[in-house]
Curated annotation (Swiss-Prot):
Mn(2+) 1 binds at residues 284, 298. It holds the Pfam family CPSase_L_D3. It comes from Streptococcus uberis (strain ATCC BAA-854 / 0140J). Mg(2+) 4 binds at residues 832, 834. This is Carbamoyl phosphate synthase large chain.
């Protein structure tokens, strides 16, 4: 069927900010879809609230709205644009839920807007647990024994009938949000209550647990003519019971017989056909390892995280094909862009093994509950490709960037046998490394399989890796064992450890003996047809399929897996850098390990290498390609951390040179640079042991800010107020040594602001100055940022411009740099300089109209700012006000304290733009799901040092008609100052205490600040935890609460008697 001509304009809904369970894969999918629709001649309108996306660039759609993804705002855009159709299936769970909501309001019918891709009935059948259960019964597809509940009492009754364990699955939620495995009544009460609260339709499925079965996924496509195919099948390393987003996953499935594969394939195709889905769909199934019995677990009637993985694993562009199916094209009418010959109806075939490994945030959140279950906790993932399971697994391990380069963790050898058993039975994020340790201690595959329910086949692969290690240890400096180990994915670094040599010694020996990787093409057809797409992975085999180009090329290093502190913003910068390289006449080569991102879409660069970002793997690509140079400054700290080793290997680093990178990152050199150009910074010093730390803190005075050097996202950064806390920090938070010094600075409580600057070595362009709403002490990534600044005097602005220029010139910056300032008593201090692109680049690019990463790349390649049409100094400011607001995923991470501080905790961001600060703030709060009504009840629980400041705030809320509740100390203070307050009991004082009030549903917001006192801290953490669980807007910074008050005041009318 030819494409539809009765529709001309299509609105695409994006997925909004990055949260756990919904990350960069939707930027990749949305970008592909918008470009595919434009390619077919449709007018595309995009709405998304996330500025850190390629999808929201002006070139991707005909009109782009970066507005809150709420029914209110999307309805306004629908009325303004009057599209013929709406495509919600590329916006994740957010897109689906929004489509449902818009349909319920009647606006789609009113405006005659058709829903494309997947009909509402299909969304309902897949997402509504009751309808899904009925459909599976009608299809005679087995599902676990289950019941739909709308109350905790119903859940308890059903569990008493079928027995524990049971799994709770809330309807219409993302990444298993609110769900979990329950083994008793107490757990079931708790998880069901949360699940019902988080489900937009107040519905949960309680099902008999089948934890321990194999978990298999099928990524399927279907068109309007009922043509359907399986793009990819995947098998989880972990059994059912651990969310697939938190599991290691292999593609294709490794342990299925042909009969089992056909059984599950047929079931998946039957389901997509019954749902009449037009586009992509993900089917998750559980297979009994001891029989042919299987169960259907879940169906996602949309493009998902697994779709992105399947696309990158096979090369089949699922989102692009899904978008074209939505406008009427059929699978047998579309050419597969990888081969350029076969049709999209042709099922991909793989002659390699893909491993996906999740990246967890527990290096940031040491207090978090690391146990894995049905609720997702990973922030990102890596993918690796090899010819064997062992090779792809070991490549994935060293892609994670968690300080390991093999499937082992050295510290685990110190764990006693009893603890090791517990770590194996109760799965955590690091179970893979405990499995390796258990095998080293002589545990058998059968024993481990019994304990973990992991298939013996996978455990045998781990044992094989161990056998290769032993062989290497016995036969040092021999060619055959080295070659054998490289074929199975061993890194030079691991071999160096086993041979007691340096990594460079192993590399030299390897090259001397002709042991080099070859690069194979990802072609969707197992080399049956010639492929046109230069998308490669390394392996140690015969025949290299990647030939170095005769044209001049530049290698750009990506930023690896998404984690807190280094997110999608860096991928945005990478993609823009590639565009500029190509525009300058060079071939652009990307190297990255993240399957979720736009940068690893094979159509973005001239060549894509899907490889770990380690010195060894990068040098292997450089040896083959011989690029003119390597660009590091868009790959976040991942790429910057490789600079020194690449420089030592005489690799040309383009942009700011390594010696100047070191002058910005090394504390003593940086202090000298600031001193030389007469720029003030907080008093501070580098220390290498506990005694030095105490001496420095005593000299500069408490409070102090302590942090390790060379980190991103403020990892392990703390404000310390007393000597005892400083010692605790030095002993537990960091590994301190002369190689890994700790920085101790005087903590200045002032107005924080930051600048992204672009320099050609002569002139310095400052696109704009961002002013933080929260005072210094809250990490810049967790602060709300306003552009243009609203409260900085002209003198302060001029000083910031002056200091930025001086720093850029002194540090010989070529390209981008980010500088953070704090202003106190009219003095501007420099807190930090990052000699690279920062996470604010997409935001500032969008609000100023300057394609910052492209401009910086052109400067790196030799252009000047003047040649590009830019002047030295501050760029003209925007007529609108723009607010960037952070997004957190605390509801997925139990036991993580949501109190904001110097260590970054946010996973994503949104933007609010309008003609005034109040309107922009309102949009930013709405986009970040911080909806506070015009009146209601608000709780204040405030530390002593903040009571005076909070009084003015409480009076403001009271004047608007809010009823003020406060814990005893705060209440007494408010009453002394004539503010009417309802006193509530602290935790444990009486039965009707603060937590019960919060669970009652009568509270509209909680304002909580904390002291460093241990008892207060525990109570405060519990209050914050309950607020997050109950979905109550929580403010832990008075500055953020003041911003919300300002919004509410701007929307209220004054009411006065005569």
């Amino acid at each position: 069927m030819p494409k539809r001509t009765d529709i001309k304009k299509i609105m695409v809904i994006g997925s909004g900010p990055i949260v756990i369970g919904q990350a960069a894969e939707f930027d990749y999918a949305g970008t592909q879809a918008c470009l595919a629709l434009k390619e077919e001649g449709y007018e595309v309108v995009l709405v998304n609230s996330n500025p850190a996306t390629i999808m929201t660039d002006k070139e991707i759609a005909d009109r782009v709205y970066i507005e809150p993804l709420t029914t209110e705002f999307v309805s306004r855009i629908l009325r303004k644009e009057r599209p013929d159709a709406l495509l919600p299936t590329l916006g994740g769970q957010t897109g689906l839920n929004l489509a449902m909501s818009l349909s319920e309001t009647g606006i789609l019918n009113e405006l005659g807007v058709e829903l494309l891709g997947t009909k509402l009935s299909a969304i309902n059948q897949a997402e509504d647990r009751e309808q899904f259960k009925a459909l599976m019964k009608a299809l005679k597809q087995p599902i676990p024994e289950s019941d739909i509940v709308h109350s905790v009492e119903e859940a308890l009754l059903f569990a008493s009938q079928i027995g524990y364990p049971v799994i709770v699955r809330p309807a219409f939620t993302l990444g298993g949000t609110g769900g979990g495995i329950c083994t008793n009544d107490i757990e079931l009460e708790d998880i069901t209550a949360k699940g019902l609260k988080l489900s937009p339709v107040n519905q949960c499925l309680i099902e008999k647990s089948i934890a321990g079965f194999k978990e298999i996924e099928y990524e399927v496509m279907r068109d309007s003519a009922d043509n359907a195919l399986v793009v990819c099948n995947m098998e989880n390393f972990d059994p059912v019971g651990i969310h697939t987003g938190d599991s290691i996953v292999f593609a294709p499935s490794q342990t299925l017989s042909d009969y089992e594969h056909q059984l599950l394939r047929d079931a998946s195709l039957k389901i997509i056909r019954a749902l009449k889905i037009e586009g992509g769909c993900n089917v998750q199934l559980a297979l009994d390892p001891n029989s042919f019995d299987y169960y259907v677990i879940e169906v996602n009637p949309r493009v998902s995280r697994s779709s992105a993985l399947a696309s990158k694993a096979t090369g089949y562009p699922i989102a692009k094909i899904a978008a074209k199916i939505a406008i009427g094209l059929q699978l047998d009418e579309m050419i597969n862009p990888i081969t350029g010959k076969t049709y999209a109806m042709f099922e991909p075939a793989l002659d390699y093994v893909v491993a996906k490994m999740p990246r967890f945030p527990f290096d940031k959140f040491e207090s978090a509950d690391r146990h894995l279950g049905t609720q997702m906790k990973a922030t990102g993932e890596v993918m690796a490709i090899g010819r064997t399971i062992e090779e792809s697994l070991l490549k994935a391990c060293r892609s994670l960037e968690i300080g390991i380069y093999h499937n082992e963790c050295k510290e685990f050898s110190l764990v006693d046998d009893q603890e090791l058993l517990m770590k194996l039975i109760k799965a955590q994020d690091d179970r893979l490394f405990y499995l390796s340790e258990a095998l080293k201690r002589g545990m058998t595959i059968d024993e481990l399989s019994q304990l973990t329910k992991i298939n013996p086949f996978f455990l045998d692969k781990l044992l094989h890796i161990l056998e290769i290690e032993r062989q290497l240890s016995l036969e040092k400096w021999q060619k055959w064992p080295l070659e054998h180990a490289k074929k199975y994915g061993f890194s030079d670094k691991k071999i160096a450890e086993l041979w007691q040599a340096s990594e460079s010694d192993i590399r030299d020996f390897r090259i001397q003996h002709g042991i080099k990787p070859v690069y194979k093409m990802v072609d969707t057809c197992a080399a049956e047809f010639e492929s046109q797409t230069p998308y490669y992975y390394s392996t140690y085999a015969f025949e290299n399929e990647s030939q170095a180009s005769p044209n001049k090329s530049i290698l750009v290093l990506g930023s690896g897996p998404i984690r807190i502190g280094q997110g999608i913003e860096f991928d945005y910068a990478t993609v823009h850098s590639v565009k500029a390289i190509q525009a300058a006449g060079y071939e652009a080569i990307i190297m990255n390990s993240n399957p979720e991102t736009v940068s690893t879409d094979f159509s973005i660069s001239d060549k894509l290498y899907f490889e770990p970002l380690t010195v060894e793997d990068v040098m292997n690509v450089i040896d083959l390609e011989r690029p003119e140079g390597v660009i590091l400054q868009f790959g976040g700290q991942t790429a910057i951390n490789l600079a020194e080793a690449l420089d030592k290997a005489n690799v040309p680093i383009l942009g700011t040179q390594v010696r100047d990178l070191d002058r910005a990152e090394n504390r003593q050199l940086f202090e000298k640079a600031l001193h030389d150009i007469n720029i003030p910074q907080p008093l501070g010093q580098t220390v290498t042991n506990e005694q030095e730390a105490l001496q420095v803190a005593r000299r500069i005075g408490f409070p102090v800010l302590v942090r390790p050097s060379y980190v991103i996202g403020g990892r392990a950064m703390q404000i310390v107020t007393q000597e005892e806390d400083l010692l605790t920090y030095m002993q537990s938070a960091v590994k301190v040594s002369s190689d890994q010094p700790v920085l101790i600075d005087s903590y200045i409580l002032g107005q924080e602001c930051e600048v992204d600057a672009i320099s050609d070595g002569q002139d310095v362009l400052i696109p704009g100055i961002m002013e933080h709403i929260e005072a210094a002490g809250v990490h810049s990534g967790d602060s709300m940022a306003v552009y243009p600044p609203q409260n900085l005097s002209e003198d302060i602005i001029q000083t910031i411009i002056d200091y930025t220029k001086r720093l850029a010139i002194n540090l010989n910056c070529k390209g981008m740099m980010n500088i953070q300032f704090v202003v106190k008593d009219k003095t501007v201090y420099v807190i930090e300089v990052n000699p690279r692109a920062s996470r604010t680049v997409p935001f500032m690019s969008k609000v100023t109209g300057i394609p910052m990463a492209q401009v910086a790349t052109k400067l790196i390649l030799g252009s000047s700012l003047k040649e590009l049409g830019y002047e030295d100094g501050l760029y003209q400011k925007s007529s609108l006000v723009h607010v960037k607001a952070p997004i957190f995923s605390f509801n997925k991470l139990s036991k993580v304290d949501s109190l904001l501080g110097p260590e970054m905790k946010s996973t994503g961001e949104v933007i609010g733009s309008d003609s005034s600060l109040e309107k922009a703030l309102y949009k930013a709060f709405e986009a970040s799901y911080m909806h506070v009504p015009d009146f209601g009840n608000i709780i204040f629980t405030i530390s002593d040092d903040k009571k005076a400041e909070s009084l003015r705030l409480a009076k403001g809320f009271s004047a608007l008609g809010y009823r003020i509740f406060a814990t005893s100390g705060t209440s007494d203070y408010f009453l002394q100052h004539q503010l009417k307050t309802q006193k509530i009991h602290k935790i444990g004082e009486q039965s009707d205490h603060i937590l019960e009030l919060m669970k009652s549903g009568k509270i509209q917001a909680v304002i909580n600040t904390d002291s460093k006192n241990g008892m207060m801290n525990r109570d405060g953490q519990l209050i914050r935890s309950i607020a997050n669980e109950q979905g109550i807007p929580l403010f832990t910074s008075l500055d953020t609460a003041k911003a919300m008050l300002r919004v509410l005041e701007s929307r209220s009318f004054s009411i006065q008697s005569l």
